[in-house]
Amino acid sequence: LHKAIRRQRQMCIRDRNIAFMLICSALVFLMTPGLAMFYGGLVRKKNVVNTMMTSIFIIGTGIVMWVLFGYSLSFAPSSNGIIGDLSWIGLEGVSLTEGYKDSAAIPNMVFCGFQMMFAIITPALITGAVAGRMKFKSLFVFIILWSLIVYYPLAHMVWADGGLLGLDGIGALDFAGGDVVHISSGVSALVLCIILGKRHDYEHANYRIHNIPTVVLGASLLMFGWFGFNAGSALEANGLSAHAFMTTAVSAAAAILSWMLCDVIKNKKPTLIGASTGMVAGLVGITPGAGFVPIWAAVIIGLTTSPVCYLMISFGKKKFGFDDALDAFSCHGTGGIWGGLLTGVFSSTAINADAGNGLIYGEFAQFGAQALGIVITLVIAVAGTLICYGLTRIITGKIRVSKRDEMLGLDITQHGESAYPSFNGLDN
């Protein structure tokens, strides 16, 4: 009788974890439409359709690719710790009952669904850097290639059993995607925008954000989904997921306040766009360490990530001369690097036994692993993006739109649609 009761209790706990993870998966999915709104509100109205489309189409390519071969390449067994084999192609052999790992609290298929949402949002982040000047067909091909060449190998190296960069490798900590999601996409965005070159009227035109309420709504949806992003990375409903939930909220809140302070110092007034961007920066900063650092450390991470990203946006872009249109690198790349390093400063075995103690506890090894993991991620992202660009040029030809199309706007020239058809004339 006691064995039957124990078995029933275990089944209830497993069912609870499955429900929790499916909800978190749905929350992470919501981040992609949220990103479409966030980016769409930031551009001029002649590029709204194109900008939002560059996020939405990835829902299609991302899911189909993930089911066919993406999950297998990312998480199937491997002998090299770099890329999975094809044993799970088409999700063949992905169990509905057995866990991904021996100790997993959820079935392999549930884990697959959760990770699928990460594979959608990550390449979508890149598109903000090239808004308004890249041909849609070229971006379509580039994103497919980037997922294959950069994302799937990185996901395997950091999160899969035996991965080169993760706990079975050099020991770099990445709870929910500092390396895999934000640094990879942010650095790739930087490389791609440098290759494309600046917009034709860059530094000469006054780029007006066309819809601030849409930006705020998009940022809010991103934060809402981010709770599933970070808390769900605990992979079960337990104290660690609650801890990740709280560090996520605290870092975002602190980052909002510090960005507002930066606005006041520089421009004498706080801005709604600034507060929204600060929210996203704080979320990026806490992502690698959400399940590894104390809650008080999340305050420090949020407070410092905003100024670092703010400096890159306000001074770094001009100093280094790159046109990161919607600050994909400045927020995600810069914030991801900063957050990854601070994870090596504040990580604590008292929070998560998988983590080593950070610099603040007098130990250097974890910080060194974080720095090495970031450097390797940078190399993979840069090299992979250059390869993807070269292949895209071969497949589609010139990837940048003509000056005429850029001036007219990509909504009409690439899609034959207008976000606001009742308005006449061009956006200046």
Language-model region placement:
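Glycine- and aromatic-enriched membrane alpha-helices
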Residues: 10, 14-428
